């Protein structure tokens, strides 16, 4: 069993292609690629922590998308999840749904939240990490200089993680490259 992290898939959200400069011709290609990439990595026995903004609005298709994805899916609620979550059948496809969660990934204490945070439980300790989403690949906002100094705050957004779920070690590697490239 492995643990994977992913955020900001925005299934069904055409504008996310333009907003984030995603390399897809349309939303159908984006959805197909995200599903294909997910299932190429994740087995049915794996846990996938989705750090928010899973989908956009269309609740009936959300349930169908979740059913196509391998693994036990844990949803950390994001700002774009509120609309589709009115469909209880779609929500029921997730193993758990919560706005904030702490887990152990090997010897690490990991706080999971859709939004980046300045501090979290034991954030000054070397074993404590934050994994978040929400910011996509945005390096223009006022928080960016601060975020580049936070080595144990990791962005699980698909826009910097090759549009697929990633392991903790892959998150570290991808975030270091992203921060270095944009600092």
Q: Predicted regions: what is each one?
A:
Residues 91-183:
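Conserved beta-sheet core of the metallophosphoesterase superfamily
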Residues 2-105:
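Core catalytic region of metal-dependent phosphoesterases/phosphodiesterases
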Residues 1-2, 117:
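Short amphipathic alpha-helices and their capping/turn segments at secondary-structure boundaries
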């Amino acid at each position: 069993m492995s643990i994977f992290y992913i955020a900001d898939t925005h299934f069904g959200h055409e504008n996310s292609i333009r907003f984030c400069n995603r390399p897809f011709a349309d939303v159908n290609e984006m959805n197909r690629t995200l599903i294909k990439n997910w299932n190429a990595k994740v087995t049915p026995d794996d846990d996938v922590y989705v750090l928010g903004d899973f989908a956009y609005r269309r609740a009936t298709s959300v349930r169908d998308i979740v059913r196509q994805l391998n693994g036990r899916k844990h949803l950390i609620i994001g700002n774009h999840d509120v609309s589709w979550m009115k469909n209880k059948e779609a929500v029921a496809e997730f193993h758990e749904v919560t706005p904030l969660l702490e887990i152990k990934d090997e010897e690490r204490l990991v706080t999971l939240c859709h939004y980046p945070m300045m501090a979290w439980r034991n954030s000054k300790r070397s074993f404590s990490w934050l994994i978040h989403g929400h910011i996509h690949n945005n390096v223009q906002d006022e928080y960016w200089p601060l975020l580049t100094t936070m080595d144990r705050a990791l962005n699980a957004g698909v826009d910097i993680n090759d549009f697929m779920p990633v392991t903790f070690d892959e998150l570290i590697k991808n975030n270091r490259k992203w921060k270095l490239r944009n600092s």
